[in-house]
């Protein structure tokens, strides 16, 4: 009898969407944590330039995600996991961007093309398949909630920040107990009714979410490698953003930044053979 109960419980656990996502994304999760940008965080070596560029991309990603979550908040697949008061990140990122870039921070945002692709996908599924938002909300929000406090302390120490200003993104004042809240969130997510086809698609979307994050991290690192210590990063853009290819990666940028980037690339071509196409 006890064995039957354990088998039944195990079967139910294996059917939980949260457990299935965790299982199918295990390998790609490790890859995401092994990117150069994330390793800098883990080693306590994150720089101000790294963090500022990361914040710019996080702003665009959460802008897309939270607009689509808000728009689909009554959808049967989204409503159970819609927790704007507890999880919304956009306002916290805006606060951090203003701290680092000043009141005109919106004119100084620079993001790689990988970020644009990520955002495009979120908006696309928000329009066509809102149930896929489950995958992006789960991987983003619970990932940030799980590592937020630790990464916040690492960032504060690495960048030698005196207080919590600039680190609002890592704080979840609406969540008194992260562990209890994550349990509630998973329970709500597991309660969403999906067909087998939809469930399979959500699992694939979760894999895609991690792949998008890896691409963003890699593109950001390429930008940092080329523009380290250059004043062009974060300069105002007076015209619509354009794209530039660096080492096979398309980077979303502005005319002034592109000029600085091009000069840096020319020097790099002479010294290490890096060619801008």
Swiss-Prot record:
According to its UniProt record, where is this protein located?
A: Microsome; Endoplasmic reticulum
Catalytic activity entry: heme b + 3 reduced [NADPH--hemoprotein reductase] + 3 O2 = biliverdin IXalpha + CO + Fe(2+) + 3 oxidized [NADPH--hemoprotein reductase] + 3 H2O + H(+)
InterPro entries in alphabetical order: Haem_Oase, Haem_Oase-like, Haem_Oase-like_multi-hlx, Haem_oxygenase_CS
Q: Which GO terms describe its biological process?
A: heme catabolic process; heme oxidation; response to oxidative stress
Annotated GO CC locations: endoplasmic reticulum
Pfam family for this entry, one? Heme_oxygenase
Query: Which parts of the sequence bind heme b?
Result: 29
Q: Could you tell me which Gene3D superfamilies the record lists for this protein? A: Heme oxygenase-like
Could you tell me the superkingdom of the organism this chain comes from?
Answer: Eukaryota
Q: What does this protein do?
A: Heme oxygenase cleaves the heme ring at the alpha methene bridge to form biliverdin. Biliverdin is subsequently converted to bilirubin by biliverdin reductase. Under physiological conditions, the activity of heme oxygenase is highest in the spleen, where senescent erythrocytes are sequestrated and destroyed.
What does the sequence similarity comment in the record state about its family? Answer: Belongs to the heme oxygenase family.
Name assigned to this protein: Heme oxygenase
Source organism phylogeny: Eukaryota, Metazoa, Chordata, Craniata, Vertebrata
